[in-house]
């Protein structure tokens, strides 16, 4: 039996649309991500459990886990008789890399179960391809950090998909999912096809400045560059209270705040626990819209996908 956990992630991290992603884990050591269990079987079977399993397609052939298995069968050119259980702990359309969690956990679990016939590079490319089936375009800003851990800069040149960049270990990431869902594909259609030269220059400056600040260990400087001028101005149509929420959180002492991926989850960054707890309490009281929503104080998960349990 193989049991693999893949952590949630923040796509874009505000400043790096489609090229930055960070894996996260709650500081209380709880698991925020999906779990895949694989055992030997005479034929393929898939069982879904977990808090958000009711959001999954009723047709098993539309389940991303089944699609992962199908791709593996094609790559290895043989049928793989296994029993797979998906523990769906991440809400679909949350902005926290829900589909990436399932994809990464499944691909790693199948590859591990069959003694790793596919190398890490090919695995990551497969993950990106599978993610594209759901979001409408191939991108790695969720699958890469969920798989490899840390904060990943997506390069996708030659045989290099991504590179792990330096992080600030004292940064706390307060994550809030309000309890509603937004389609990634829908959120992407809101974005313009072209941007002005001014916006492109400012975005380049922000991203370059942020990367530089992480490597030179300038925490304050890094936070100053964490502005999303590519997606946020357009996606706030789906989050009518975001700008007001963001201002309140900044006034409470957050050093940065943004939309996680396509939303509706948001993140706030703090460099001290007291402020993080205050922000978490406020978000719990005022940002969550139903009892399905949640708030977690997290740190960057530096491990990524991993075996758990036995």
UniProtKB/Swiss-Prot annotation:
Q: What is its EC number?
A: 2.7.1.39
Look up the record and name the pathway of this protein.
Amino-acid biosynthesis; L-threonine biosynthesis; L-threonine from L-aspartate: step 4/5
Task: Quote the subcellular location field of this record.
Answer: Cytoplasm
Pfam family membership, one: GHMP_kinases_C
Q: Which InterPro entries match?
A: GHMP_kinase_C_dom, GHMP_kinase_C_sf, GHMP_kinase_N_dom, GHMP_knse_ATP-bd_CS, Homoserine_kinase, Ribosomal_Su5_D2-typ_SF, Ribsml_uS5_D2-typ_fold_subgr
Q: Which GO terms describe its molecular function?
A: ATP binding; homoserine kinase activity
Its GO biological process annotations read: threonine biosynthetic process
| Primary location | cytoplasm
| Catalytic activity, reaction form | L-homoserine + ATP = O-phospho-L-homoserine + ADP + H(+)
Does RNA-binding show up as a keyword for this record? no
Which keywords has UniProt assigned to this entry? Amino-acid biosynthesis, ATP-binding, Cytoplasm, Kinase, Nucleotide-binding, Threonine biosynthesis, Transferase
Q: What does the entry list as the binding residues for ATP?
A: 91-101
Key word Amino-acid biosynthesis present: yes
Q: Which GO terms describe its cellular component?
A: cytoplasm
Report the sequence similarity comment from the record.
Belongs to the GHMP kinase family. Homoserine kinase subfamily.
Q: What does this protein do?
A: Catalyzes the ATP-dependent phosphorylation of L-homoserine to L-homoserine phosphate.
Spell out the protein name for this chain. Answer: Homoserine kinase
Name of the coding gene: thrB
């Amino acid at each position: 039996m193989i049991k693999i956990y893949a952590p949630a992630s923040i796509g874009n991290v505000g400043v790096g649309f489609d090229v930055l992603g960070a894996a996260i884990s709650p500081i209380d050591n709880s698991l925020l991500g999906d779990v895949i269990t694989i055992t030997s079987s005479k034929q393929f079977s898939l069982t879904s459990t977990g808090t958000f399993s009711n959001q999954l397609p009723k047709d098993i052939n539309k389940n991303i886990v089944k699609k992962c298995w199908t791709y593996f069968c094609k790559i290895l050119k043989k049928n793989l008789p296994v029993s797979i259980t998906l523990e769906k702990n991440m809400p679909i359309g949350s902005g926290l890399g829900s589909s990436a969690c399932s994809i990464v956990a499944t691909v790693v679990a199948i590859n591990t179960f069959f003694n790793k016939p596919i190398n890490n590079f090919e695995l990551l490319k497969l993950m990106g391809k599978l993610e594209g089936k759901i979001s409408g375009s191939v991108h790695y800003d969720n699958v890469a950090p969920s798989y490899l851990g840390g904060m990943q800069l997506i390069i996708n040149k030659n045989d290099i998909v991504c590179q792990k960049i330096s992080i600030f270990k004292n940064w706390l990431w307060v994550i809030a999912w309000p309890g509603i869902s937004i389609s990634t594909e829908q959120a992407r259609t809101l974005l313009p096809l072209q941007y002005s030269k001014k916006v492109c220059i400012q975005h380049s400056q922000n991203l370059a400045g942020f990367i530089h600040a992480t490597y030179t260990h300038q925490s304050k400087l890094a936070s100053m560059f964490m502005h999303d001028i590519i997606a946020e101005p357009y996606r706030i149509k789906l989050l009518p209270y975001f700008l007001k929420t963001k201002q309140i959180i900044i006034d409470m002492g957050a050093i940065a705040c943004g939309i996680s991926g396509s939303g509706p989850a948001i993140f706030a960054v703090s460099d001290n626990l007291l402020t993080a707890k205050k922000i978490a309490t406020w978000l719990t009281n005022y940002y969550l819209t139903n009892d399905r929503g949640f708030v977690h104080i997290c740190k960057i998960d530096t491990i990524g996908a991993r075996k758990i349990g036995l």
